[in-house]
């Protein structure tokens, strides 16, 4: 079977790595990923030029295309590939609105009475935002309606001082058509612990993966700018230390109800559904959906797959997805980034990656925003690579990952607290306080 992975980051490297032993592997990427280029035939080009991607797939007799990033999904890459006879792991443009149009997602919850929603309003002018916030006596979250690479959301009490600043940021979002819409969503701020559940979907059935928790803040202690994610962990048993089986099951039910609603409102959803939840005193609440794997969370779950990913892909396109099995391990992912990220890029600087020692430690490296030139790896400004380790406990996996992070030399930084016992316990205690 010939499988094409579309995308160039660490998420796509993890997807390719999970497929490499069972398929003839191809990749279409905007820049050469040093890890993917070793294991796949590839073409370099803009992943958003969907006709060119489809031509590459047809020319190489691709059986299944696996779409990594959100931007091509929003442009209709799946529709274009399927028009050319290529089956896809990824939703159609219409179904991908679950991520690309947050107002569509919230309205879906409203229209189909799906549990786990929250107070929200969509606005297209500043005066209405101002009037609403004058009467709203709780902190809020301000979100552009469309895609902003995970960096457009601002929270009162974190990035914004008060609801007055929320008004000003809302005006900026509308005036600049941030995310491609002249609209803004205002949501109530939830108090709790965030967690992620990702699931394989075949249009009808949903096979959930182990839960994970991301760490979006740039610096240790959960401070600094919100990034695409500085690392994440998952636990043995598929839950998290603060997440019960009942809460996990409730979140999965919300995702199943969403899957049914998308099929009625748009088209059957095939691919990966990523649910970002907040565990609150009232149970799990849906923060947002992504129409693809999370980055970094893909790196937690894909190395734990027991069922071959190639078999899962075939089941998704055939519509007969059943239970997907994972090895019962914990995992920790730590992102290596340019020192001072996200304000400083160190673009063009060389880093050294001792892949052999990382492998000998039992960890994996997944490359992201780096370039390869004359066998040297260069930073290109954003998150550089993910280091992932698994173990019988989060503590064991974290220690391996931390040792492996020392195998990267250069002007780089990582959050050494991701997955540590102290930080995990802080999450557990926070949840206990909320529930009591």
Curated annotation (Swiss-Prot):
Pfam families xrefs: GARS_A, GARS_C, GARS_N
Q: Which coenzyme or cofactor does it need?
A: Mg(2+); Mn(2+)
The residues listed in the UniProt record as binding Mg(2+) 1, with positions renumbered to this chain, are 276, 288
Q: What is this enzyme's class at the first EC digit?
A: ligase
Quickly give the catalysed reaction.
5-phospho-beta-D-ribosylamine + glycine + ATP = N(1)-(5-phospho-beta-D-ribosyl)glycinamide + ADP + phosphate + H(+)
Which Gene3D superfamilies does this entry report, sorted A to Z?
3.40.50.20, ATP-grasp fold, A domain, ATP-grasp fold, B domain, Phosphoribosylglycinamide synthetase, C-terminal domain
Explain how, and how many, cofactor molecules are bound: Binds 2 magnesium or manganese ions per subunit.
Single Gene Ontology BP term?
purine nucleobase biosynthetic process
Superkingdom of source: Archaea
Q: What EC number(s) are associated with this protein in UniProt? A: 6.3.4.13
| Keywords, in A-Z order | ATP-binding, Ligase, Magnesium, Manganese, Metal-binding, Nucleotide-binding, Purine biosynthesis
Q: Is Cytoplasm found in the keyword set?
A: no
* InterPro entries named among the record's database cross-references: ATP-grasp, ATP_grasp_subdomain_1, PreATP-grasp_dom_sf, PRibGlycinamid_synth_ATP-grasp, PRibGlycinamide_synth, PRibGlycinamide_synth_C-dom, PRibGlycinamide_synth_C_sf, PRibGlycinamide_synth_CS
Q: Which residues bind ATP?
A: 133-196
**GO MF annotation terms:** ATP binding; metal ion binding; phosphoribosylamine-glycine ligase activity
Chain positions recorded as Mn(2+) 1 binding sites: 276, 288
Could you tell me which residue ranges the ATP-grasp domain spans?
Answer: 106-318
In this chain, Mn(2+) 2 is annotated as bound at 288, 290
Family as reported in the entry's similarity comment: Belongs to the GARS family.
Question: Mind telling me what this protein is named?
Answer: Phosphoribosylamine--glycine ligase
Native source species: Methanobrevibacter smithii (strain ATCC 35061 / DSM 861 / OCM 144 / PS)
- Its gene name is purD
């Amino acid at each position: 079977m010939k499988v094409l992975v579309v995308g160039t980051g660490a998420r796509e490297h993890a997807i390719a790595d999970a497929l490499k032993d069972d398929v003839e592997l191809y990749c279409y990427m905007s820049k050469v990923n040093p890890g993917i280029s070793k294991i796949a035939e590839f073409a370099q080009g803009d992943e958003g030029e969907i006709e060119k991607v489809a031509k590459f797939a047809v020319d190489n007799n691709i059986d299944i295309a696996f779409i990594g990033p959100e931007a091509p999904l929003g442009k209709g890459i799946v529709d274009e590939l399927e028009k050319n006879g290529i089956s896809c792991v990824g939703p159609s443009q219409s179904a991908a609105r679950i991520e690309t149009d947050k107002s569509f997602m919230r309205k879906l919850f409203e229209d189909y009475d799906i549990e786990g929603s929250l107070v929200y309003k969509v606005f297209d002018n500043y005066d209405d935002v101002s009037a609403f916030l004058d009467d709203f006596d709780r902190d809020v979250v301000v979100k552009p309606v469309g895609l902003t690479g995970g960096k457009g959301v601002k929270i009162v009490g974190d990035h914004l001082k008060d609801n007055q600043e929320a008004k000003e940021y809302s005006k900026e979002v509308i005036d600049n058509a941030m995310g491609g819409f002249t609209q803004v969503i205002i949501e109530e701020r939830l108090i709790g612990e965030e967690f992620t559940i990702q699931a394989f979907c075949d249009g009808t059935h949903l096979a959930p993966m182990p839960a994970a928790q991301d760490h979006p803040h740039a610096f240790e202690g959960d401070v600094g700018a919100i990034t695409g994610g500085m690392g994440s962990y998952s636990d043995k048993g598929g839950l998290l230390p603060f997440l019960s089986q009942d809460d996990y099951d409730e979140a999965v039910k919300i995702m199943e109800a969403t899957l049914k609603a998308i099929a009625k409102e748009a088209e059957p959803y095939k691919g990966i559904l990523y649910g970002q939840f907040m565990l609150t005193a009232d149970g799990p609440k849906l923060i947002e959906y992504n129409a693809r794997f999370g980055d970094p969370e893909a790196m937690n779950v894909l190395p734990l797959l027991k069922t071959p990913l190639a078999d899962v892909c075939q089941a998704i396109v055939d519509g007969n997805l059943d239970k997907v099995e994972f090895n019962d391990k914990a995992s920790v992912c730590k992102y290596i980034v340019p020192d001072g990220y996200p304000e400083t890029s160190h673009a063009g600087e060389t880093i050294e990656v001792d892949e052999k020692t990382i492998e000998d430690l039992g960890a994996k490296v997944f490359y992201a925003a780096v370039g390869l030139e004359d066998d040297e790896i260069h930073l290109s400004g954003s998150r550089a690579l993910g280091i992932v380790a698994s173990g019988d406990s989060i503590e064991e996996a974290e220690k391996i990952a931390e040792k492996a992070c020392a195998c990267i030399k250069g002007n780089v930084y990582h959050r050494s607290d991701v997955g540590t016992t102290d930080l995990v316990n802080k999450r557990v205690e926070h949840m206990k306080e909320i529930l009591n």
